[in-house]
From Swiss-Prot:
It comes from Aspergillus fumigatus (strain ATCC MYA-4609 / CBS 101355 / FGSC A1100 / Af293). It is found in: Secreted. Keywords: Cell wall biogenesis/degradation, Disulfide bond, Glycoprotein, Glycosidase, Hydrolase, Repeat, Secreted, Signal. Specific in hydrolyzing the terminal glycosidic bond of polygalacturonic acid and oligogalacturonates. The keyword ATP-binding does not apply. GO terms for biological process: cell wall organization; pectin catabolic process. InterPro entries: Glyco_hydro_28, Pectin_lyas_fold, Pectin_lyase_fold/virulence. This is Probable exopolygalacturonase C. The active site is at D231, H255. Disulfide bonds join C389-C395.
């Protein structure tokens, strides 16, 4: 079953009163303020406010506060790029609207402007409205999803919503409604994200590639947020260290809390350590906890914990593959099938909930077999755990404990396990073989 919009709104409303935490103290006062004017109302929603927005970011690029006015609508018909920011607060108290003309947006992307908002610089804070009716970026992605050709996962020339590269910064009350595709590429150091909302629920076509946060950096936390989408809620990419994803609710047709994909380019050495995913509710998703790397990849991912994860109607609650495939991507060059992105010190602890037995999978399947079933023998959709290690030495010190996952059919939970050897994984918690899940 899928969560309806009223249910989603209930979850969103429940998060508003939660404490946001103390903001970072700026090194220097933000003594200048740029309040952005809007022509939306006077033009009956037809005028482009992008020039006024660009002007504000140019005038207030340092030690400033840039304000989208409370309850005011803004048309952002052209991409905004501000890469020279320093000690700036972006205060989004109104609502932003991307163009609804698909062809116009595609032409902009084809011209080389692939990201709609690009922000870069130290201490760049995003502060959305406390009022849940405001602070939204409206991308009108539903029309894009519905226009996607049958049996295709890649509608051409879709923009990324936002690239955000900063340090010593916070993002609070970020809200994205119907993103066309990817939401936020987040890069940097010492960044806290809290009370974010991504609503990519669809009434028609599947919302392909609507990732919540694609993360690359150090000391980054994402907490107290809701993401209902059609791809990873969070995807941790290389290099990344000390990442926390906690107290969040994710779902719709989500691809869960993911690491990767890694190793597609075997010359790109993966380097990821110290990740913690904790106290997360996962609803109606394809995956909950996922690791994905390509065979032939290189590198190391170490010290990863998923803990206290609650699943409701999830197809693959725990999923590891070191032989990932992407139905919309191809590889070039020589691939060594015995090379892997090494995994070491992984823990899955205190998982509880239900496995989607009756209607497994999601709308991202456009191939036969479905991309997410490739290489899995005799799927029953009672699998609590799927571990696909590429070689007998590529998975080390895996640990499971407190796994209480149950198929909706009330059959016994099962496991698919390949090459996670007992010698390298003495605390795995079950025998690595395909069949009924029997915890030790």
């Amino acid at each position: 079953m899928l969560i309806t919009n009223p249910a989603l709104l209930g979850i969103l409303a429940s998060l508003v009163p939660l404490a946001l935490g103390a903001p970072n103290q700026p090194i220097q006062a933000r003594s200048r303020k740029c309040v952005i004017p809007s022509s939306y109302a006077s033009s009956h929603g037809t005028a482009d406010d992008s020039p006024a927005v660009a002007s504000a970011f140019a005038q207030c690029a340092e030690n400033s506060v840039i304000v989208f006015q409370e309850g005011v609508d803004y048309n952002i018909f052209h991409p905004i790029k501000a890469t020279n920011l320093s000690n700036v607060e972006i205060r989004v108290l109104g609502n932003l609207h991307l163009p609804q003309d698909i062809t116009a947006v595609q032409n902009i992307v084809k011209s080389g402007q692939s990201t709609w908002f690009t922000f870069q610089g130290p201490r760049v804070d995003w502060t959305g409205a406390d009022d849940i009716k405001n602070g939204w970026i409206n991308s009108y992605g539903q029309a894009w999803w519905d226009a996607n050709p049958a049996n295709s996962s890649s509608f051409p020339n879709r923009p990324h919503l936002m690239s955000y590269k900063t340090s010593q910064a916070s993002i609070k009350n970020f809200r994205s409604r119907k993103p066309i595709a990817w939401n936020v590429k987040l890069q940097g150091d010492d960044i806290t994200v809290s009370h974010a909302i991504v609503d990519a629920t669809s009434t028609g076509g599947f919302p392909f590639n609507t990732d919540g946060f694609d993360v690359e950096g150090t000391n980054i936390s994402i907490t107290d947020s809701v993401m209902f989408n059609g791809d990873d809620a969070i995807a941790v990419n290389t290099p990344s260290h000390n990442i926390v994803f906690a107290r969040n609710t994710i779902g719709y047709q989500s691809h869960g809390m993911s690491i990767g994909s890694l190793g597609k380019d075997p010359t790109d050495f993966a380097n990821i350590t110290n990740l913690r995913f904790e106290d997360v509710t996962v609803i109606d998703a394809l995956y909950a906890a996922r690791f994905k790397s390509w065979s032939g990849g290189r590198g190391l991912v170490k010290n990863v914990v998923w803990k206290n994860i609650r699943t409701f109607n999830v197809t693959f609650p725990i999923f590891v593959t070191q032989s990932y495939s992407d139905q919309s991507a191809s590889r070039s060059g020589t691939i060594d099938p015995f090379s892997s992105v090494m995994m070491e010190d992984f823990t899955w602890s205190d998982f509880s909930g239900t496995i989607n037995t009756y209607h497994p999978g999601d709308g991202s399947c456009v191939t036969d077999p479905c991309w997410y079933n490739v290489g899995l023998p005799n799927l029953k959709h009672t699998e609590a755990i799927v571990l696909e290690c590429n070689t007998e030495s590529s998975c080390k010190n895996f640990r499971t404990e407190g796994i209480r996952l149950h198929p909706q059919s009330k059959d016994s939970p099962s496991v698919i396990c390949m090459k996670a050897t007992a010698e390298l994984n003495p605390k795995l918690g079950f025998e690595c073989k395909n069949g009924t899940f029997v915890p030790h």
